[in-house]
């Protein structure tokens, strides 16, 4: 038997639907009825319908009403009539909206919205009224669909935050309609055909179809779960469609969100051999469920012809003309492909130093940093976004006072560099004096003069050895000093931090003390977003020779590649993960570690130096986002001991899972080249962190035998963009506000804290209202479990005194926090890094 629905379509008749509807009517009246009696009523309804032809939905519902009243169930029949009327009203508003837009297929989307968002505050009647206020004569169907989405966006408030999910569904529907028309117009059907088309147009890397068969692509297409689009907020989906999916050269999106996730998974699983389709599925599920986000360059560039997947690079600038310009050239090439940069200037001679014996000839680091600044502005990724670079200088460098005023608004503009991000490398001695004797003298010196006079580079040492040599230099009258007090430097640092948000802080002794690969090198600085801490070494010129090849004169320059650091990043979306489920977390971390390891081998490198370092150390940086989201969902206040205990446990679990996954990967694919003698191999890594439990001791023994696949594992990036994609809070930061309006291209875009509700409301305390000591203590607890560093911001208000800000720096240093990113004053807007947005 078939029944004709209101849209005219005939479908199989399902009598259980009548049973369920009547049961709901009885339940709604608080009337108990047994299954036997209900089945008798159903049988009577069916008997009376037997002669009905054709059978329609309205005819069935009329018969249910009549049968209920015949049996004396008048109140239930009345409730059923009211229920029908309510459903009819819901259908009418859906029909009206769909008809106004001119898209009949929209009705099903609206029906799902009514089913999933049942609270009165999400009534489609409100949407209809707002939408109709935007409609104007002569609008196209696409313009009306856009107006409908805009209406849902504007209905988003702190009291009705789920409108951002409704807006996302409407945006996704209109996008999918346009996308289907685009492919229909190109005469392309299945996924393989679309990938072939994109490849032929130079929009998709030909390596994907070269590695996968037609049958494998068809299998991958079956992995797609379009319903996961419903996980997007409007902000996340809008960002993804504008910046992450593949677009034609006329900026028309040609890839759905789920196809984007699948394309990334296909790329990252390419080298997995016969088992690759299993890993395609795991990578796709991890990404499409928004449990893990890859860094912005990986999300944007995986599957494309120029697949530069790394976020950040770090270079050690040599103290020579050739070396400095080589570093500038390296930065330009990195910036061209969307990478951010960290540059260590601690080896470059200070202003007034000698050049080839000529006194006072050197111009100092500021002149070179201004060239870096201009390069960042000039190399702007096809006009999309200017380059981004952090420049690091040691706290004892003679050019430090001028360096600390690079971005301030007062002083000589010829000594400014407003488009770079300055950062200072602090030894323990500096903070110890700031804490114990802030009026103590502090001596600024030129690294070139020290090397010339003493025969060693002071910046090549750390800890007690650095202190011993620093005092040796201070007491050597042959070395010129620029003597100030610690207080003078602290004042300059804090004044700049409050005014500009910078300099970033790099605690060099804390970093090197916990470096698991200290046996092969030293860490001089961090990257653009202060989460990377890996061994560094400058590129060295060896020789320049002239050869004749095939009758042509060829100039060959030989260089020693040094250690040019590369950051391959991803983030666990803690707000979207069951962090208490150890098995689930271990599986998720294992999948993410494997994906990051594959990035190393599948990456397109803008520089050979980067490729060589990355393949030698195989360093990765798995971090987190959704930290505040995670706490709020569990009813944990930021300013509480419960927060501190919880974060300690969660990050120990993440670290354990990461080390366990990495050593298993080493057994399968081989250990990194410099494993022998590392803290991993000797067990010092585990001892330094106090990992003494039975399971940690067992894991340490396994690591010593099997090795580690990657030299560095964990690094917490800011995730400013990718956290929006996954609908969670950024990095380890507290939220800025529960709800606010962001101005974007002339319109106001609502931003809502993740899963904001009456249950989470009181656990979302705004960043600037939080006692920052709690944030610092939490960072110290996390740092124990993170072998690299974390992008940790300080949030201050205008009420903070300089002494209070200094106290936070000192607390962070004492807690073992390796780096501090921005100092975000409430009155200050600072630019987020997009490269490290994992």
Segments and roles (model prediction):
Residues 180-274, 357-371, 383-387, 392-527, ...:
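Conserved, charged catalytic cores of large soluble enzymes
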Residues 9, 32-262, 278-284:
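Core nucleic-acid recognition elements
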Residues 286, 328, 588-611, 619, ...:
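Internal maturation/activation junctions in enzymes
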């Amino acid at each position: 038997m078939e029944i004709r629905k209101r849209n005219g379509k005939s479908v199989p008749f399902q009598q259980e639907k009548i049973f369920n509807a009547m049961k709901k009517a009885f339940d709604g009246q608080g009337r108990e009825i047994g299954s036997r009696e209900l089945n008798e009523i159903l049988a009577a309804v069916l008997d009376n319908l037997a002669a009905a032809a054709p059978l329609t939905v309205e005819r069935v519902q009329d018969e249910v009403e009549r049968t209920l009243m015949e049996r004396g169930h008048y109140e239930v029949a009345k409730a059923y009539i009211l229920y029908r009327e309510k459903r009819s009203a819901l259908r009418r508003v859906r029909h009206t909206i769909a008809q106004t837009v001119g898209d009949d297929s929209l009705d099903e989307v609206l029906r799902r919205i009514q089913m999933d968002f049942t609270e009165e505050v999400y009534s489609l009647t409100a949407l209809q009224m707002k939408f109709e206020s935007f409609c104007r004569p002569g609008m196209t169907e696409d313009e009306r669909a856009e107006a409908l989405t805009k209406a849902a966006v504007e209905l988003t408030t702190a009291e009705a935050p789920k409108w951002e999910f409704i807006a996302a569904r409407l945006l996704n529907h209109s996008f999918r309609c346009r996308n289907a028309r685009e492919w229909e117009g190109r005469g392309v059907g299945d996924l393989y055909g679309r990938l072939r088309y994109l490849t032929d147009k130079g929009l998709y890397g030909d390596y994907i179809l070269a590695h996968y068969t037609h049958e494998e692509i068809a299998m991958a297409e079956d992995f797609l779960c379009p319903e996961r689009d419903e996980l997007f907020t409007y902000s996340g989906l809008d960002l993804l469609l504008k910046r992450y999916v593949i677009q034609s050269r006329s900026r028309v999106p040609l890839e759905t969100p789920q196809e984007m996730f699948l394309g990334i998974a296909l790329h990252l699983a390419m080298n997995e051999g016969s088992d690759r389709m299993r890993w395609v599925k795991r990578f796709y599920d991890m990404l499409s469920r928004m449990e893990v986000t890859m860094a912005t360059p990986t999300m944007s560039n995986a599957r494309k012809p120029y697949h530069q997947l790394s976020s950040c690079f770090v270079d050690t600038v040599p103290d020579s003309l050739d070396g400095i310009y080589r570093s500038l050239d390296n930065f330009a090439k990195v910036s061209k492909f969307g990478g951010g940069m960290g540059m260590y200037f601690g080896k470059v001679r200070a202003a007034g130093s000698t050049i080839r014996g000529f006194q006072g000839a050197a111009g100092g680091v500021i002149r070179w940093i201004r060239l870096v600044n201009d390069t960042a502005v000039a190399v702007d990724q096809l006009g999309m976004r200017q380059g981004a670079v952090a420049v690091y200088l040691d706290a004892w460098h003679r050019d430090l006072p001028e360096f600390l005023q690079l971005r301030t608004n007062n002083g000589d503009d010829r000594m400014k560099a407003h488009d770079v991000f300055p950062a200072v490398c602090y030894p323990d001695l500096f903070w110890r004096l700031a804490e114990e004797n802030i009026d103590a003298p502090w001596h600024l010196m030129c690294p070139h003069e020290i090397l010339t006079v003493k025969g060693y580079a002071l910046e090549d040492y750390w800890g007690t050895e650095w202190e011993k040599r620093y005092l040796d230099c201070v007491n050597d009258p042959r070395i010129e000093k620029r003597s100030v007090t610690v207080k003078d430097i602290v004042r300059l640092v804090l004044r700049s931090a409050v005014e500009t948000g910078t300099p970033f802080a790099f605690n060099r002794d804390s970093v090197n003390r916990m470096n698991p690969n200290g046996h092969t090198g030293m860490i001089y600085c961090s990257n653009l977003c202060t989460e990377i801490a890996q061994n560094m070494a400058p590129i060295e010129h060896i020789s320049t020779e002239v050869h004749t090849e095939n009758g042509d004169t060829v100039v060959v320059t030989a260089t020693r590649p040094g250690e040019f650091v590369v950051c391959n990043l991803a983030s666990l979306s803690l707000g979207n993960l069951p962090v208490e489920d150890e098995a689930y977390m271990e599986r998720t971390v294992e999948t993410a570690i494997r994906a990051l390891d594959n990035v190393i081998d599948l990456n397109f490198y803008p520089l050979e130096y980067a490729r060589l370092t990355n393949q030698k150390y195989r360093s990765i940086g798995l971090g987190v986002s959704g930290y505040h989201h995670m706490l709020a969902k569990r009813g944990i206040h930021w300013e509480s001991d419960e927060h501190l205990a919880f974060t300690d446990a969660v990050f120990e679990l993440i670290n354990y899972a990461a080390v366990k996954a990495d050593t298993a990967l080493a057994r399968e694919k081989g250990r990194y080249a410099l494993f022998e003698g590392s803290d991993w191999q000797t067990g010092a890594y585990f001892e330094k962190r106090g990992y003494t439990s039975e399971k940690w001791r067992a894991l340490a023994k396994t690591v010593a035998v099997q090795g580690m696949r990657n030299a560095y594992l964990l690094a917490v990036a800011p995730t400013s963009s990718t956290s929006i994609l996954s609908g969670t809070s950024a990095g380890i930061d507290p939220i800025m506000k529960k709800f606010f309006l962001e101005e974007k291209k002339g319109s106001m875009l609502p931003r809502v804290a993740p899963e904001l509700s009456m249950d989470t409301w009181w656990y979302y305390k705004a960043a600037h209202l939080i006692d920052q000591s709690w944030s610092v203590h939490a960072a110290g607890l996390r740092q124990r479990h993170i072998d690299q560093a974390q992008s940790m911001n300080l949030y201050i208000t205008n009420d903070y005194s300089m002494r209070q800000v200094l106290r936070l720096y000192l607390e962070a240093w004492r807690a073992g926090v390796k780096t501090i990113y921005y100092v975000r004053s409430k009155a200050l807007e600072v630019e987020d890094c997009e490269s490290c947005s994992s």
